[in-house]
UniProtKB/Swiss-Prot annotation:
Cofactor: Mg(2+)
Membrane topology: Multi-pass membrane protein
EC number of the protein: 2.5.1.39
Gene source species: Chromohalobacter salexigens (strain ATCC BAA-138 / DSM 3043 / CIP 106854 / NCIMB 13768 / 1H11)
Name of the protein this chain belongs to: 4-hydroxybenzoate octaprenyltransferase
GO BP annotations, alphabetical order: ubiquinone biosynthetic process
EC top class, as a word: transferase
Length: 298
C-alpha cells in the first residue's frame, strides 16, 4: 500500500474531526433527542412548569455529553462485531481510524465533564449519577449475554428522570418512577424497531436483542410495549391532574405509534429504521403536551 493510500485511510489533524463526530454520534442527533425528551418531561413536571434556567442548562448539556459517552463505549464494546454488520462496518473504531486508546481517553473526558455538571446540583443527585454511569457503561456489553439489552438501555435513557426530580424537589416521588417505567417500555419498543434493522446480521455473529428473541412476534410485542407506555403516561397525567393539552399530546403519541406499525408491517430494513427515527416526534408531542398543560397563561 502506498503512503498516499495509507494517509487517506488514516487521516490526521482536522481531517479526523468527522470520525470523532461519527464516534460520538454528534452528526446523528436522533439518539440525543430520544434521551432529551424524557429528561425534559421530568424537568417540567418536577418544576410544575418551566424549570430554573441553570438546572435546565445542566441537564441539557449533560444529555449531550452522556449520550456522546454512551456512543463511545458502545462502539468500543462492539469494535470486533461492527465490521460484520452492514450498517456498522464503517464505524471509526471498527475500521481503525480511531484507536482503542483514543476512545478510552475520550470516554473518560466526557464522563469527567458530566460529573462536573452534576456536581452543580446537590449531593443526592450526584449519588444518583453513579447509577447512570454504571448503566451507560454496561449496556453495550449486555447484548453478548442477554436478549434484553434494550431493557438496560431503557434504564440508562430513563435515569435522567429521577435525577431531574431529585435536583429540583430533593425527592423522587411515585410519579417519577411511573414516568421512568413508561420511558423504559417506550425505549424497549423503539430499540426493538432499531434492532430489527440488524437482526439478520446479529444472528450471524451471535449478538442478542429483543428483536432476535421476539422473532415473528416482534410487532405484537412492540405494540404491547407502546400500549404500556401510553397507560403509564396516562397514570402520571391523572395523578398530577394535567390538563387537556397533555391528553392531546398522549393521543398524538398513540397516532404516531399506529403509523410506525404501518411502517414495520413487512419488516423491511429501511422502513424499520424510519419507524425508529419517527420516535423523535413521539417524544416531542408528549413534551409539548406537558409544557402547555403547565403553562401559567393557559
Amino acid at each position: 500500500m502506498s503512503a498516499d493510500s495509507s494517509d487517506a485511510a488514516h487521516p490526521s489533524g482536522l481531517a479526523r474531526v468527522p470520525d470523532f463526530l461519527r464516534l460520538t454520534r454528534l452528526d446523528r442527533p436522533i439518539g440525543t433527542w430520544l434521551l432529551m425528551w424524557p429528561t425534559l418531561w421530568a424537568l417540567w413536571l418536577a418544576a410544575e412548569g418551566i424549570p430554573e434556567r441553570g438546572t435546565l442548562l445542566i441537564f441539557v448539556i449533560g444529555v449531550y455529553v452522556m449520550r456522546a459517552a454512551g456512543c463511545v463505549v458502545n462502539d468500543y464494546a462492539d469494535r470486533h462485531f461492527d465490521g460484520h454488520v452492514k450498517r456498522t462496518r464503517d464505524r471509526p473504531l471498527a475500521t481503525g481510524r480511531i484507536t482503542e486508546k483514543e476512545a478510552k481517553v475520550l470516554f473518560a473526558g466526557l464522563v469527567i465533564i458530566a460529573f462536573g455538571l452534576v456536581c452543580l446540583t446537590n449531593l443526592p443527585t450526584v449519588l444518583l449519577s453513579f447509577a447512570a454511569l454504571a448503566l451507560a457503561a454496561t449496556y453495550p456489553f449486555m447484548k453478548r449475554y442477554t436478549h434484553f439489552p434494550q431493557v438496560v438501555l431503557g434504564a440508562a435513557f430513563s435515569w435522567g428522570i429521577p435525577m431531574a426530580f431529585m435536583a429540583i424537589q430533593r425527592q423522587v416521588p411515585l410519579e417519577a418512577w411511573l414516568l421512568l417505567a413508561a420511558n423504559v417500555a417506550w425505549t424497549v419498543a423503539y430499540d426493538t424497531e432499531y434492532a430489527m434493522v440488524d437482526r439478520d446480521d446479529d444472528l450471524k455473529v451471535g449478538i442478542k436483542s429483543t428483536a432476535v428473541l421476539f422473532g415473528r412476534a416482534d410487532r405484537l410485542m412492540i405494540g404491547l410495549l407502546q400500549a404500556l407506555t401510553l397507560l403509564l403516561l396516562a397514570w402520571v397525567g391523572l395523578r398530577l391532574a394535567l390538563g387537556g393539552f397533555f391528553w392531546l399530546g398522549l393521543a398524538a403519541m398513540g397516532a404516531i405509534f399506529v403509523f410506525q406499525h404501518r411502517l414495520i408491517r413487512h419488516r423491511e430494513r429501511d422502513h424499520c429504521f424510519r419507524a425508529f427515527l419517527n420516535n423523535h416526534w413521539a417524544g416531542l408531542v408528549v413534551f409539548a403536551g406537558i409544557a402547555l398543560s403547565l403553562w401559567p397563561m393557559l
